[in-house]
Amino acid sequence: MSQDPILTSKGSQEEEEDFFGLDNFFPEPESPLPPPFSFASYDIPANIDFYVPDHRKSLILRLVGSHPLWGHHLWNTARTLSTYLLETPQITQSRHVLELGAGAGLPSIVCVLAGSSKVIVTDYSDEGLLDNLRFNVDVNLEGEEKERIAVDGHVWGQSVDPLLGHLPKGQKYDLLILSDLVFNHSQHDALIKTVEATLTSSSTQSYDPSNPSAPLTEPSILVFFTHHRPHLAHADMAFFPRLAESGNGWAYEKVVEEWAGAMFENDPGDKKVRGTVHGWRAWRVRDGEERGEKPSRISL
């Protein structure tokens, strides 16, 4: 989702009109009513058992009617990521989780249901987006579950003090969720800056050359996405080498590659590319570990 709000300034002609009070004679027409909300649902996998309000078998997500930051869609990437989180409980249970650019907030809600100790779900500091996230939290969580999640605004690359303020003093997050964000190529550096500042650096495992993959309990980030613009897939993937070179270095591995269907049937580009969700996990390199890509966890 874009983190570049567009700022405008008045030109000399507009200033002149304001000075002469012409706006009083020719008032601007009222803005049209915002598009109505829409709703989407996520069906909980049959092999997963936890309580949802009203004993529903699905989570209900309200989507903003329209938004330049694309919060008006429930992306297939979020669905695939949520299923991965439910089927890989060790990566979420009893963890502090932060989701960036959350949209409707589905993965964050799933993390709470899966047993995360604290979840902070964020998006750009736009009140319409944040109010919608609060609505989805209220609809899908109850009681103590609702106490384990908070909604906050954050602009990537800016101060993370408000985000860390949700945790006990001196602590950071064990898991970061980035769902369909890397398409925003101009914001890779800002996104990495937030990642570096919020993920805990404490490692529970030492590097084992015979097993190059970090344990799933290692502090890590999940980066799931679809190449919505196939001709720019290389620019999406540029996020990872850039991440690998940041800080003290990062390693990353593919954990998911799944056909989910193209979001928009008539968009240009190979439909198979546009409809495949890719999931990666990244972690800070441990002592003696080389940065960069590791062998995939999946059989392609």
Curated annotation (Swiss-Prot):
**UniProt-listed GO biological process terms:** methylation
Q: Which InterPro entries match?
A: EFM7 (IPR025784), Methyltransf_16 (IPR019410), SAM-dependent_MTases_sf (IPR029063)
Q: What is its EC number?
A: 2.1.1.-
Extent of the signal sequence: none
Q: Which UniProt keywords apply?
A: Cytoplasm, Methyltransferase, S-adenosyl-L-methionine, Transferase
Q: Which GO molecular function terms does the record list? A: N-terminal protein N-methyltransferase activity; protein methyltransferase activity; protein-lysine N-methyltransferase activity
Taking the record's annotation, the residue ranges forming a coiled coil are none
Question: In the UniProt record, does the keyword Glycosyltransferase occur?
Answer: no
Please state where this protein is localized.
Cytoplasm
| Primary location | cytoplasm
Family to which this protein belongs = Belongs to the class I-like SAM-binding methyltransferase superfamily. EFM7 family.
Q: What PANTHER family does the database record attribute to this sequence?
A: HEPATOCELLULAR CARCINOMA-ASSOCIATED ANTIGEN, PROTEIN N-TERMINAL AND LYSINE N-METHYLTRANSFERASE EFM7
Q: What is this protein called?
A: Protein N-terminal and lysine N-methyltransferase EFM7
